[in-house]
Design a protein with these regions (language model features):
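Alpha-helical cap/lid subdomain in secreted, periplasmic
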Residues: 1-140
């Protein structure tokens, strides 16, 4: 099994190299992602692939201009979802998972799930693992 979660660092690169909201290069992201998947399949044609949606929450640095950065993250997520379909991979909707958790009235604050808006806490990782097992575990 090849399980891949990438995308947020692409946002971080754009965020760190600019003075304000900029666009992420989704064409390059897709080309690089395809290269990884194609080379993996070439090495092991039987590999089962799991592709995870990148995610952010409005915590830490993402709070400023969150709507813009979230739209950029969603663009990357759409690429991942498309590739999952093309490569017959399992798709893990992690942004959807964290959106649902963020809107749960029992959540004390968003940093309960992600301490900086990018990196999950232990509680966030637990929910990700549960989703992974639900979607992938039955196919093992």
């Amino acid at each position: 099994i090849l399980s891949v979660l990438v995308g947020v660092n692409d946002l971080l690169d754009v965020y760190n190299k600019t003075d304000g909201p900029q666009e992420v290069d989704t064409a390059r992201f897709e080309a690089d992602y395809r290269d990884i998947l194609d080379r993996s399949r070439a090495q092991n044609p039987e590999v089962r692939i799991v592709l995870a949606e990148p995610f952010i929450l409005p915590v830490g640095m993402w709070q400023e201009h969150y709507t813009h950065w979230r739209a950029q993250c969603d663009r990357l997520g759409a690429v991942v979802k498309k590739l999952a379909k093309e490569y017959d991979a399992v798709f893990l909707p992690y942004q959807g998972l964290f959106d649902k958790l963020a809107h749960d009235a029992r959540t004390p604050k968003l940093s309960y799930w992600m301490w900086d808006g990018t990196h999950p806490t232990a509680a966030g990782h637990e929910k990700m693992a549960e989703l992974w097992m639900q979607r992938v575990g039955s196919k093992l």
